[in-house]
C-alpha cells in the first residue's frame, strides 16, 4: 500500500479517534447488542439490528484508521529545512490577483482537509498548483470555477 502523508496533528487526531472508538464506542455498542438480545426474538428486533449495523460501521472505521496509521508518512514541517518553497505541511498566504483577496492555507493530508479551517488537501487543485512555488511567485491554478491567478505572499513552516 502507498504511503499516506499526514502532519503530526493529523496523525494525533486519528490516534485519538481510534482510542475513542476502541475504548468508548466499541464497549457501548457491545452493551447495546447484549441488551437487545435480552429482548428475545432477534429476527424482528430493530434495536439488535441497529446495534449490529453500528458495530459494523465502528469496526470498519477502526480498520480504516489502523490501515492509514500503519501506512502513514508523518511529516513534521517544523523540522524541515526552510528553503522558502511550498511543501506538504507548509502554511501559505496567497493573494488572489483577480479579487485582491488574501487567503492563508495549510497544506495537509486528505483526512485532515477542512476548507472551513483553511486546511487544504495536498491533492487539491490549489495545493497541487502551489507545491514547489516560492514567495513572490505568481501561479495560475485551474479550479472547478475556472482559472485563478495567485501570488504567493508568504511561506511558513509552522
Swiss-Prot record:
SUPFAM superfamilies: FKBP-like, GreA transcript cleavage protein, N-terminal domain. It comes from the Bacteria. GO terms for biological process: DNA-templated transcription elongation; regulation of DNA-templated transcription elongation. It holds the Pfam family GreA_GreB_N. GO terms for molecular function: DNA binding; RNA polymerase binding. The keyword Zinc-finger does not apply. Keywords: DNA-binding, Transcription, Transcription regulation. InterPro entries: GreA/GreB_C_sf, TF_GreA/GreB_CS, Tscrpt_elong_fac_GreA, Tscrpt_elong_fac_GreA/B, Tscrpt_elong_fac_GreA/B_C, Tscrpt_elong_fac_GreA/B_fam, Tscrpt_elong_fac_GreA/B_N, Tscrpt_elong_fac_GreA/B_N_sf. Belongs to the GreA/GreB family. Necessary for efficient RNA polymerase transcription elongation past template-encoded arresting sites. The arresting sites in DNA have the property of trapping a certain fraction of elongating RNA polymerases that pass through, resulting in locked ternary complexes. Cleavage of the nascent transcript by cleavage factors such as GreA or GreB allows the resumption of elongation from the new 3'terminus. GreA releases sequences of 2 to 3 nucleotides. This is Transcription elongation factor GreA. It comes from Salmonella typhimurium (strain LT2 / SGSC1412 / ATCC 700720).
